[in-house]
Amino acid sequence: MEQDQQTETKTTYADQPWKKQYSKHIPSKMDFAGLFLPDFLQRSVQNFPDKAALIFQGYVVTYKELQDMVDRFAACLKSFGIQKGDSVAILLPNTIQCVVSYYATIQLGGIVVMNNPLYADPELEHQFNDSGAKVLITLDLMANRMIDLRTKTNITQIVSTSLADYMPIAKSFVLKTAGKTRKISDYLPALPLIDKIPVLGNIKHAVCELQKLTADVKTAPDVYDWKELLANFAPDRSRAQLNDDDVVMYQYTGGTTGVSKGVMLTHGNMSKQLQQASIWFPELEDGKEVVLGALPFFHVFGLTTVMNFSVYKGWTNILVPKPQADQLLDIIHNYRPTFTPLVPTMFINMLNHPDIKKSDMTSIKACFSGSAPLAVDIIHEFEKMTGAVIIEGFGMTESSPVTHMNPFDGIRKVGSVGIPIPATECRIVDLETGENDMPVGLPGELIVKGPQVMKGYKNRPDETEKTLRDGWLYTGDIATMDEDGYFYIVDRKKDMIISGGFNVYPRDIDEVIYAHPKVQEACSIGIPHSTRGEAVKVFIVLKDKETATENEIIDFCKTRLAKYKWPVEIEFRVELPKTNVGKILRKDLRKQEIDRRSNG
């Protein structure tokens, strides 16, 4: 009966019912300014020249200083031969050098390629070659590896920089006199120790503790030192002539579905995305906020909602290269951020930290969660313990990335990814052809259209044709829309489990198991079943010091799920595989399960 009533609804996607949820300050039709990212930086420099733009481990860069650094490095890149349309690869964590390199490249009309520092050489080789990158900026910790890898790519110049380049004098001294480790994986866990370096005291001990944070770079042709370059080049304030359709970056997909693809995002995409986001948060004032820069900038979520949004609004960005829970809590206490975009894992880890109840998080005006679904129970628990409000949203690399958000000052439906942001159209279509609209309330594939939607995939016309159809971006996500225009992500299309002829969405199972008081993380997959075709298996990480049995979890599910959704297997693990931004890799668990069964 309920389904019949849903089918008979008169609301259609063309009606755009979500617009009724817009606050009075959100226009139903946006009038976009014809400005681009370099213009936004220049505007913030003019309006807030002496305001802190970036803070890294206590080192402060004002907007005026940031522009000077950008102009100097732009002059350097120009001397390397970089011009409009050329690709520059950035292989850095969240550092001052990362922000400067990005804006210097796009100021020249170059195309940025943001690479993940934790990727293995074959992954980086693919991205360097696919993008045609000519110059690479990286840490000294990775430089020797990249010098060796360069022979397999078209990269001509490498710029090496150090974590010590922008730190208060005492910290810089320790790093520059430390040991010579060359593995990026070695240095990441040690980053929180930087804050514990004494100005006076046992420097020898500090050197030993921090010897993993710097490295010698071997001599090689066309390998340059960052600080020397900035000192030797005068600022070049020239700007390339930019258009909406010019590509600003090749943002490679996370590889959760196979070989990463280079998403071509344009200057128009990124500019309009920032304008869409800005109008959504009316209480966040230009030049007056502090953003927690914990999301990695090599991921488009962090790049847009932290790095570029902060520059657009003239805010202070607290750079966090390694966002561990204790470090996040310390930064929130010391720097009092007002805007904190995070991913679910960061919320969960802070929530499980023993100091969470002692932490004062009242400075936060808005929390934004994206990249992966945030379990409803986690939202409730985090808000109860912190007093902060979490706004959940949705997006993907191909949409710059945000398409949906819960209203900041309107009705917030917990569990929903919200409503389409201004100038964004959405439909739910059938899974078979992708051409027919599903009745409102019934699941189908979410497709979106808007100024933030990518130009296409680099060197992949076949994939572009499948994903972009008549301007509509086919997300691969199964979703529903309610009568008010709020959207709910049911699951990934490729993750759906078919059990006994019924569609089972793993997120439904995950949500229930997250409600169990002993469970910290959960991820469901489909496994072969002799009679049903597929059945549900769940991988679980328990909270610290908790114990549970398979029967206990299954019995918990039996009182909360339809019989065809009941798990038949539970596997407890110490940790689950994740991307570098904390998204649980369901495909990896599925592959591990297939391999295990194949090997008997």
Regions found by a protein language model. Give the residues of each.
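Conserved AMP-binding/adenylate-forming core of the ANL superfamily
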Residues: 31-33, 38, 42, 50-83, ...
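Conserved adenylate-forming
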Residues: 77-83, 232-246, 250-293, 313-315, ...
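Gly/Ser/Thr-rich phosphate-binding loop
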Residues: 177, 337-342, 351-412, 425, ...
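Conserved pre-ATP/AMP-binding loop-to-beta segment of ANL
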Residues: 185-252, 259, 284-290
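Conserved AMP-binding/adenylation subdomain of ANL enzymes
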Residues: 271-290, 298-339, 353
